[in-house]
Swiss-Prot record:
Enzyme class: ligase
Catalytic activity line of the entry: tRNA(Ala) + L-alanine + ATP = L-alanyl-tRNA(Ala) + AMP + diphosphate
Protein's name in the database: Alanine--tRNA ligase
EC number(s) recorded for this UniProt protein: 6.1.1.7
Cofactor, free-text remark: Binds 1 zinc ion per subunit.
Record note on domains: Consists of three domains; the N-terminal catalytic domain, the editing domain and the C-terminal C-Ala domain. The editing domain removes incorrectly charged amino acids, while the C-Ala domain, along with tRNA(Ala), serves as a bridge to cooperatively bring together the editing and aminoacylation centers thus stimulating deacylation of misacylated tRNAs.
GO cellular component: cytosol
Role played: Catalyzes the attachment of alanine to tRNA(Ala) in a two-step reaction: alanine is first activated by ATP to form Ala-AMP and then transferred to the acceptor end of tRNA(Ala). Also edits incorrectly charged Ser-tRNA(Ala) and Gly-tRNA(Ala) via its editing domain.
Keywords: Aminoacyl-tRNA synthetase, ATP-binding, Cytoplasm, Ligase, Metal-binding, Nucleotide-binding, Protein biosynthesis, RNA-binding, tRNA-binding, Zinc
Pfam families for this protein: DHHA1, tRNA-synt_2c, tRNA_SAD
InterPro entries found in the cross-reference section: aa-tRNA-synth_II/BPL/LPL (IPR045864), Ala-tRNA-lgiase_IIc (IPR002318), Ala-tRNA-ligase_IIc_anticod-bd (IPR018162), Ala-tRNA-synth_IIc_core (IPR018165), Ala-tRNA-synth_IIc_N (IPR018164), Ala-tRNA_ligase (IPR050058), Ala_tRNA_ligase_euk/bac (IPR023033), DHHA1_dom (IPR003156)
Binding positions (Zn(2+)): H567, H571, C669, H673
Essential cofactor(s): Zn(2+)
Length: 880
């Protein structure tokens, strides 16, 4: 058998079938774009459904591919077993009504056994078939020469997912030898059984029947072939390694994790081996998924990514990794996969940023959640129960963002379980509260009662008209029809023709008035009625308004002018965000008022100051270029072909309104806009913030509001300069001088603190105790921060030469703990990381680190003395 890399096997497979007249289908994105039923692309055939069901006729009925796939239904088994993965590659060859069994079997055998290709020993291959598939038996036995004792008939060799194409399948198994199993009394030791010796190499499915609604099977007029070979499993066989994780597809990530952690893979510790495997698997999945456009969040595929990253971080603690590190593995994945997936390396910086951002968020979550969970577990044990209540599990999830899966894993380690039913009950209560809140909001809208009965037409003409003659066609007061509204009364009305824009697409409604002889009506708001008409919220200021009255409808043009400036600016901002941050940016919400604009968008981390500056400059440059804004009606397909940006989740009709700003911005939009970007005047970003997982918000102003803001800022600058007795242009020099003075004072303060620390360290040596022949010092000290604590620790370790030292300090009701072990005692089994974790857990905290030095935090200062007392117990337990 040849020595081949995973990349060589993949390419060899595609080359083989290309020689057999197959077209190579590119590996599709993991995020399905044509199949809403799938969360992820999860098999090689998933992207080819359009061909198999006849919606699309392929140019070539013979297809081959190497398809990246994600499956997370067995996530808890990843790392525990030899071959479970969340990300894998499926190699396949497919026939859409062209060749069938004989060719599929013949080519599979040729690829596996020919010296030109894989070169397996034929004697080590066995096959399984369906008991009634005599055709497959004949091909295997008579044409391929496989002896009948190596052709196993199994009932489960039938591919059927309900109604639709189905048929028997044949699987090919490789015998890895007695080293992987030689107990022939084991009922599972056969090709197709649960064992490590006979591994499935390839599954060939023969779609030859149609499963009818009545349960019967009839022959398909066109028979299809669908085969699948897992690249990772095939590589483990070719490279003769015990698991998929030991192949060159995973070992570079495991090796990098060894370097980061200082731990060794396959060093006799099964728990650590599992951690290495989980990390290697999950970073592959996350790297590819983010590269294909998915981002961590709290729902859907985003939650899958968050769960995988957090599970990997959780396992990394078993390797004493207590910092963000997964992002460092992204370029390693890119290098491994670059031959077939060069885009991973191209996007590595972006992917690494996403991963690092998520890791940092989770480390904060872990710190708080672990401390609370430790208390919950301790409380449960005190109450003599082995079940963590659903209420506690929900509190961890809802308040601290601690995933239920992690709570379950921690509970399992402590020999406990989680009340899942109770947790789900709490989740349902939360959903009910959310539904009730939504109902409360809806009840405030003017979309109930008689309004649902109003079918009269109302035409909106406000894109090009600011005033129009109109008639009141419906008048409502307190949810009931009325014939009139008197002075001071409020109500709702519909006009047969209206220039008033109804709030939608983030743009607020127009304001204005209705005028008639002796009548003046203020229009306060406009919303969409249940049947789509513009519904005006009004108050009568003069006279009496009657149903069927003829009125002149006039919008507040000053207000509209400010609104349209801000709306067109959001379009420019959207494109500028994509230009600066990347094409992953998508609109997640907006608000356009006359005073300001607010734009929410998908992005993995805080937008940096220099990025904000670039974004702001781009928008202003487009304003100053005086670009015409063109608005047109297009067929939806034509608009998409033009590249128009559509809002995710928004439903559009067959004909859409396209807003185009020169050749810079192209969006589907029903709102109001300026005729030329010059009308916007100036654009100024006011704030940037995060409003949820993977969602950022920019607030900005334009025109007069931007001028007033900048004028205020100049005023503040002048005032600050006056207080510092300088002029505005020299203010930075003055600030730098003040900083230098402060820095010098800090330096003097630190020097004094170091001297005091050294004196205190000298005094502490008098408190050293000997426990079972080991010098032990556990003390509460007065220092300002962790840096001073480290300085004191170094002084003590140098003075004592051989000792176990634990120092704790309390500042602002927070506990800092530092443990240190000298080199000679590390070899005797003393471990600072394990010790500090135990000490911290006794004062409401958590932490860990290296054998020689480790830090932790706590939340209960009153328990510090009691926690430090444990140090002697620890030393005694290790010395036994």
């Amino acid at each position: 058998m040849k020595q081949l890399t995973g990349a060589q096997i993949r390419q060899m497979f595609l080359d083989f079938f290309q020689e057999k007249g197959h077209a190579v289908e590119p590996s599709a994105s993991l995020v399905p774009h044509e199949d809403p039923s799938l969360l992820w692309i999860n098999s090689g055939v998933a992207t080819l459904k359009k061909y198999f069901d006849g919606r699309v006729i392929p140019q070539n009925p013979r297809i081959t591919n190497a398809q990246k796939s994600i499956r997370t239904n067995d996530i808890e088994n990843v790392g525990k077993t030899a071959r479970h993965h969340t990300f894998f590659e499926m190699l396949g060859n497919f026939s859409i009504g062209d060749y069938f069994k004989e060719e599929a079997i013949t080519w599979a055998w040729e690829f596996l056994t020919s010296d030109k290709w894989i070169g397996f020993d034929k004697e080590l291959l066995s096959v399984t078939i369906h008991p009634e598939d005599e055709e497959a038996f004949t091909i295997w036995n008579e044409k391929m020469g496989v002896p009948k004792e190596r052709i196993i008939r199994l009932e489960e060799n039938f591919w059927d997912i309900g109604e639709g194409p189905s048929g028997p399948n044949t699987e090919i198994f490789y015998d890895r030898g007695e080293a992987y199993g030689n107990d022939f009394s084991d009922p599972e030791l056969y090709p197709g059984g649960e064992n490590e010796r006979y591994l499935e190499v390839w599954n060939l499915v023969f779609s030859q029947f149609n499963h009818n609604p009545d349960g019967s099977y009839t022959p398909l007029p066109k028979k299809n072939i669908d085969t699948g070979m897992g690249l990772e499993r095939m590589t483990s066989i070719v490279q003769d390694v015990p698991t998929n994780f030991d192949t060159d597809l995973f070992m570079p990530m495991i090796g990098a994790t060894e370097t980061i952690s200082g731990e060794k893979y396959r060093n006799g510790d099964l728990e650590k081996d599992m951690a290495f495997k989980v990390i290697a698997d999950h970073i592959r999945t996350v790297t590819f998924a983010v590269g294909d456009g998915a981002l961590p969040s709290n729902e859907g595929r985003g939650y899958v990514l968050r769960r995988l990253l957090r599970r990997a971080v959780r396992y990394s603690k078993k390797l004493n990794i207590n910092r963000p590190f997964m992002f460092e593995l992204v370029p390693v994945v890119g290098e491994v996969m670059k031959d077939f997936y060069p885009e991973v390396l191209e996007k590595k910086d972006f992917i690494a940023k996403v991963v690092k951002n998520e890791e940092e968020r989770f480390h904060e979550t872990l710190h708080d959640g672990e401390a609370i969970l430790s208390e919950v577990i301790a409380k449960a044990k005190e109450e003599k129960t082995t079940v963590i209540s659903g209420v506690d599990a929900f509190r961890l999830y809802d308040t601290y963002g601690f995933p239920i899966e992690l709570t379950e894993e921690y509970a399992e380690e402590a020999g406990m379980t989680v009340d899942h039913e109770g947790f789900e009950n709490e989740m349902e209560k939360q959903r009910e509260r959310a539904r009730a809140a939504r109902q409360d909001v809806d009840s405030m809208q003017v979309q109930g009662g008689v309004l649902g009965e109003v079918k009269v037409a109302s035409e909106f003409v406000g894109y090009g008209t600011v005033a129009t003659e109109s008639n009141v066609v419906a008048l409502v007061k307190n949810g009931e029809y009325t014939d009139s509204l008197q002075v001071g009364e409020e109500g709702q009305l519909m006009l047969d023709v209206t220039p008033f824009y109804a709030e939608s697409g983030g743009q607020i409604a127009d304001r204005g008035c209705l005028l008639a002889d002796g009548v003046k009506v203020l229009v306060k708001d406009v919303q969409k009625a249940p049947n789509g008409q513009n519904l005006h919220q009004v108050v009568v200021e003069e006279g009496t308004l009657t149903k069927d009255a003829a009125v002149k409808a006039i919008i507040d043009t000053k207000n509209r002018s400010s609104v349209v400036k801000n709306h067109t600016a959001t379009h420019l901002l959207h494109q500028a965000l994509k230009d600066v941050l990347g094409t992953h940016v998508n609109q997640a919400g907006s608000l356009v008022t006359s005073e300001r604009l607010r734009f929410d968008f998908s992005h993995f981390g805080q937008v940096q100051a220099d990025e904000l500056e670039k974004i702001e400059r781009i928008v202003n440059e487009k304003i100053w270029e005086s670009i015409d804004v063109e608005i047109s009606q297009k067929a939806i397909e034509e608009a998409k072909e033009m590249g128009a940006m559509a809002l995710f989740g928004e439903k559009y009709g067959d004909v859409v309104r396209v807003v185009q700003v020169g050749d810079y911005s192209l969006e589907l939009c029903g709102g109001c806009h300026v005729d030329n970007t010059a009308s916007i005047g100036i654009f100024k970003i006011v704030a940037e913030s995060g409003i949820g997982a993977g969602i950022r918000r920019i607030e900005a102003v334009t025109g007069k509001s931007a001028y007033e803001l900048m004028n205020d800022q100049v005023g503040l600058l002048k005032e600050a300069a006056g207080k510092m007795k300088t002029n505005p242009k020299d203010i930075l020099t003055r600030v730098d001088g003040l900083f230098a003075e402060v820095k010098q004072l800090q330096k003097e303060n630190e020097s004094l603190a170091a001297k005091l620390s050294n004196i205190e360290a000298g005094n502490l040596t008098d408190s050293v105790m000997t426990v079972d022949g080991v010098n032990v010092l556990a003390a509460k000290v007065n220092v300002a921060d962790m840096n001073n604590l480290r300085t004191m620790m170094d002084d003590l370790k140098n003075k004592l030469e051989s000792a176990v030292v634990v120092l704790a300090s309390v500042n602002d009701d927070k506990v800092n703990i530092l443990a240190g072990v000298t080199k000679d005692l590390i070899s005797q089994g003393y471990h600072a990381g394990k010790l500090v974790k135990e000490v911290a857990s006794r004062c409401g905290g958590g932490g860990g680190g290296r054998p020689d030095m480790a830090q932790a935090g706590g939340k209960n200062p009153a328990q510090v003395e009691e926690a430090l007392a444990f140090v002697q117990e620890y030393v005694k337990s290790v010395s036994k």
